[in-house]
Amino acid sequence: AIAAVITFLILFTIFGNALVILAVLTSRSLRAPQNLFLVSLAAADILVATLIIPFSLANELLGYWYFRRTWCEVYLALDVLFCTSSIVHLCAISLDRYWAVTRALEYNTKRTPRRIKCIILTVWLIAAVISLPPLIYKGDQGPQPRGRPQCKLNQEAWYILASSIGSFFAPCLIMILVYLRIYLIAKRSHLRGPRAKGGPGGGGSKQPHPVPAGASASAKLPTVASCLAAAGEANGHSEPTGEKEAETPEDSGTPALPSSWPALPSSGQDQKEGVCGASLEEEAEEEEEEEEEEEEGEEECEPQALPASPASACSPPLQQPQGSRVLATLRGQVLLGRGVATAGAQWWRRRAQLTREKRFTFVLAVVIGVFVLCWFPFFFSYSLGAICP
């Protein structure tokens, strides 16, 4: 039964890690430089499944080392090499996550394939430095027991403690501190988010824009009917319905400014209600509120241009600027500024990237937690045997 379970684990490990390597190398969306860590880690796991576990299984089932003594020394060195490489790979991945979160702009420019390959090479060199001493320094192995040969790890106390610290305890401490730091940063940004939440533009909550000085507080925004009426006035016709207020020279000579422009001093006289040159910002806000559930991420923008006269304001535009957006309503047509889609897309793209980073960090934290729990009993007992023989 044990042999069947271990054999299944060997096949599952080889198949699963081969799929990881194949996915990273063939999928365009997974060709990010940091995914090279996963390729190298999967290669180390495949080497463990093919060169280490089968011989360990045979040694456990037979009760002695069936193979040659030379292969026993190589086997033990490879065992330490591949297992240490797997643990240090996880440590390097956690540091990569930490730098990506804390130094996003600076580190993303430095996260090149060449830099990642250099880090991977350093990981393998660290594992080699920890695994090679038993091959070079034999130490006092003591008399060989009579009977069947055994293949055991180096029993030197200094090597046991040094290899345990370098292979497990130091990387484990680094990973715990790094992921704790990432968690605190994510929690701080989550608590800060509702206070500074202002949409793609980075502003605060929506507030009504100030009305220009001299404008009536009850002034209505232009509608299609008022636009047609203003056009009729420009052609010499009077309004079909409604009362018309007297127009002062100041009102006729000064065009109304958008509500988002700074207020100008005026004589305190009320301006004409229904003028098409008035601000269209409030109407745009009303329409944005109606379509907020259907189109998330919409950002209000200032009017693109200020018409010189009511007639020109009410006339349909002959040509719209490229990249601009038009909000058509039952009361008229509002031309929103260009660049809104670009700003919104950048904000949502950045938010999606941060979400993926957090999700990937959470998955790695779970994997590393399980990995540490699986390795801790062995390294604890292995180190305890050197301290208390």
UniProtKB/Swiss-Prot annotation:
<dbReference type="GO" id="GO:0006940">
    <property type="term" value="P:regulation of smooth muscle contraction"/>
</dbReference>
<feature type="transmembrane region" description="Helical; Name=1">
    <location>
        <begin position="1"/>
        <end position="25"/>
    </location>
</feature>
<dbReference type="Pfam" id="PF00001">
    <property type="entry name" value="7tm_1"/>
</dbReference>
<feature type="topological domain" description="Extracellular">
    <location>
        <begin position="388"/>
        <end position="389"/>
    </location>
</feature>
<keyword id="KW-0472">Membrane</keyword>
<dbReference type="GO" id="GO:0005886">
    <property type="term" value="C:plasma membrane"/>
</dbReference>
<feature type="site" description="Implicated in catechol agonist binding">
    <location>
        <position position="163"/>
    </location>
</feature>
<feature type="site" description="Implicated in catechol agonist binding">
    <location>
        <position position="167"/>
    </location>
</feature>
<keyword id="KW-0675">Receptor</keyword>
<feature type="transmembrane region" description="Helical; Name=2">
    <location>
        <begin position="37"/>
        <end position="62"/>
    </location>
</feature>
<feature type="topological domain" description="Extracellular">
    <location>
        <begin position="141"/>
        <end position="156"/>
    </location>
</feature>
<feature type="compositionally biased region" description="Low complexity">
    <location>
        <begin position="303"/>
        <end position="320"/>
    </location>
</feature>
<feature type="topological domain" description="Extracellular">
    <location>
        <begin position="63"/>
        <end position="72"/>
    </location>
</feature>
<keyword id="KW-1003">Cell membrane</keyword>
<dbReference type="GO" id="GO:0009986">
    <property type="term" value="C:cell surface"/>
</dbReference>
<dbReference type="InterPro" id="IPR002233">
    <property type="entry name" value="ADR_fam"/>
</dbReference>
<feature type="transmembrane region" description="Helical; Name=3">
    <location>
        <begin position="73"/>
        <end position="95"/>
    </location>
</feature>
<feature type="compositionally biased region" description="Gly residues">
    <location>
        <begin position="196"/>
        <end position="205"/>
    </location>
</feature>
<feature type="topological domain" description="Cytoplasmic">
    <location>
        <begin position="181"/>
        <end position="363"/>
    </location>
</feature>
<feature type="region of interest" description="Disordered">
    <location>
        <begin position="233"/>
        <end position="320"/>
    </location>
</feature>
<feature type="transmembrane region" description="Helical; Name=5">
    <location>
        <begin position="157"/>
        <end position="180"/>
    </location>
</feature>
<feature type="topological domain" description="Cytoplasmic">
    <location>
        <begin position="96"/>
        <end position="117"/>
    </location>
</feature>
<dbReference type="GO" id="GO:0051379">
    <property type="term" value="F:epinephrine binding"/>
</dbReference>
<feature type="compositionally biased region" description="Low complexity">
    <location>
        <begin position="255"/>
        <end position="267"/>
    </location>
</feature>
<dbReference type="InterPro" id="IPR017452">
    <property type="entry name" value="GPCR_Rhodpsn_7TM"/>
</dbReference>
<comment type="function">
    <text>Alpha-2 adrenergic receptors mediate the catecholamine-induced inhibition of adenylate cyclase through the action of G proteins.</text>
</comment>
<keyword id="KW-0812">Transmembrane</keyword>
<keyword id="KW-1015">Disulfide bond</keyword>
<protein>
    <recommendedName>
        <fullName>Alpha-2B adrenergic receptor</fullName>
    </recommendedName>
</protein>
<feature type="disulfide bond">
    <location>
        <begin position="72"/>
        <end position="151"/>
    </location>
</feature>
<feature type="compositionally biased region" description="Acidic residues">
    <location>
        <begin position="280"/>
        <end position="302"/>
    </location>
</feature>
<keyword id="KW-0807">Transducer</keyword>
<feature type="transmembrane region" description="Helical; Name=4">
    <location>
        <begin position="118"/>
        <end position="140"/>
    </location>
</feature>
<dbReference type="GO" id="GO:0004938">
    <property type="term" value="F:alpha2-adrenergic receptor activity"/>
</dbReference>
<feature type="topological domain" description="Cytoplasmic">
    <location>
        <begin position="26"/>
        <end position="36"/>
    </location>
</feature>
<feature type="transmembrane region" description="Helical; Name=6">
    <location>
        <begin position="364"/>
        <end position="387"/>
    </location>
</feature>
<keyword id="KW-1133">Transmembrane helix</keyword>
<dbReference type="GO" id="GO:0030168">
    <property type="term" value="P:platelet activation"/>
</dbReference>
<feature type="site" description="Implicated in ligand binding">
    <location>
        <position position="79"/>
    </location>
</feature>
<dbReference type="GO" id="GO:0019229">
    <property type="term" value="P:regulation of vasoconstriction"/>
</dbReference>
<comment type="similarity">
    <text>Belongs to the G-protein coupled receptor 1 family. Adrenergic receptor subfamily. ADRA2B sub-subfamily.</text>
</comment>
<feature type="region of interest" description="Disordered">
    <location>
        <begin position="194"/>
        <end position="216"/>
    </location>
</feature>
